[in-house]
């Protein structure tokens, strides 16, 4: 029962994440650009950048866009691997399935973006999205590994279980 609740929860998070990505891709070029400009403009205000502000905004907008791609796909990678880890498969298959699903979604997202006015598809974005997927998967596996090591260490420390000194 607990496994089913986890699966449903992670599946809902995958769907929400995918809908958000779809929404961003459906924005026309002007809307998308304005959102990036708003974010970098707020950053410039917080950092109190006056000198070379226009240059900062221009360069920063590109960085914000790439970080947005990476971040949203990192979260998708987290939800994908978390969902797939609820199934009893070898770890290498779980990682492969999560990676392939994430990359396929990134490719279809770029294809969808081609049909939004003022937007185009970019192989660079697919690469950044894929790196985000891999990073999300790696984060989850790292957290699980650390958790297991701490659990074993504490079990030994407090003599829980059948540990020998």
Where are the language model's segments positioned?
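Small-polar-interrupted transmembrane alpha-helices in polytopic inner-membrane proteins
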Residues: 16-21, 94-114
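Membrane-interfacial alpha-helical segments at the cytosolic side of multi-pass membrane proteins
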Residues: 73-87, 132-147
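Membrane-helix interface segments
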Residues: 4-8, 87-97, 119-123
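Membrane-interface elements of multi-pass transporters and channels
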Residues: 31, 83-91, 115-119, 142, ...
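Alpha-helical membrane-protein architecture signal
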Residues: 56, 60, 100, 124-127
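"…centered on the first transmembrane helix and the immediately adjacent amphipathic helix/loop
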Residues: 2-74
């Amino acid at each position: 029962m607990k496994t089913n609740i986890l699966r449903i929860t992670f599946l809902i998070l995958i769907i929400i994440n995918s809908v958000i990505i779809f929404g961003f891709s459906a924005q026309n070029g002007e809307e998308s650009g304005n959102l990036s400009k708003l974010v970098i403009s707020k950053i410039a205000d917080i950092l109190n950048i006056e000198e070379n502000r226009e240059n900062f905004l221009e360069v920063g907008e590109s960085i914000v866009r790439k970080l947005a791609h990476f971040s949203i796909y990192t979260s998708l990678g987290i939800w994908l691997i978390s969902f797939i880890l609820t199934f009893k498969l070898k770890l290498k298959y779980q990682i492969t399935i999560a990676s392939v699903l994430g990359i396929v979604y990134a490719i279809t997202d770029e294809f969808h973006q081609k049909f939004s006015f003022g937007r185009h598809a970019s192989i660079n974005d697919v690469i950044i999205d894929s790196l985000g997927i891999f990073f999300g998967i790696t984060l989850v596996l790292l957290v699980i590994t650390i958790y297991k090591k701490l659990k074993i260490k504490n079990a030994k420390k407090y003599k829980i279980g059948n540990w020998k000194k």
